[in-house]
Amino acid sequence: MSDVTLEQLKSEHARFGALLAQFEKQPVTTEYVIERAVIPLPAGARLAGPIFKDDGSLDYYLILHAGEESGSHDAVKAYTAGRGLKTPNRREGRLLQAAFPEFCAEGSMWLEEEHEDDSAYAWYQNYGGGYQSRYLKSVELRGVAVSRFIPSVI
């Protein structure tokens, strides 16, 4: 066995440090654990899917309820609130488009939010192309109802 010099140790140390730095830059695989959840669905309701928080953790499950009503933005929001439900927000509208394209192809619908630039307008989702834009709140569009199921940890 030959003698080991300080220079050899420093060289190997530098090489090993470079390997560690390269390893740390590699993408890391992660696991997402879906805990058992029982989601009660009323008659005619359909589960659209999960909505996640910015950190990737589960926020809630979106449920599309049966029945709809056409009307102005305010009328649609009153209709859904009167049922104890919500008008879908912009993010939820995109999930509905992905989960139920056949349902969404039936016509444009109001979304929950007023347009931030002009209170006479609100966001809607056009299902011919699936894009979201603003429309005068007085225009009659579809109103669909959703609810948000938040699994509890007991």
Residues covered by each model-derived region:
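C-terminal, surface-exposed recognition/capping segments
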Residues: 90-154
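Alpha-helix initiation/capping motif
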Residues: 1-5, 72-74, 97-100, 126
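Extracellular adhesion/carbohydrate-recognition regions
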Residues: 3-85, 133-137, 142-145
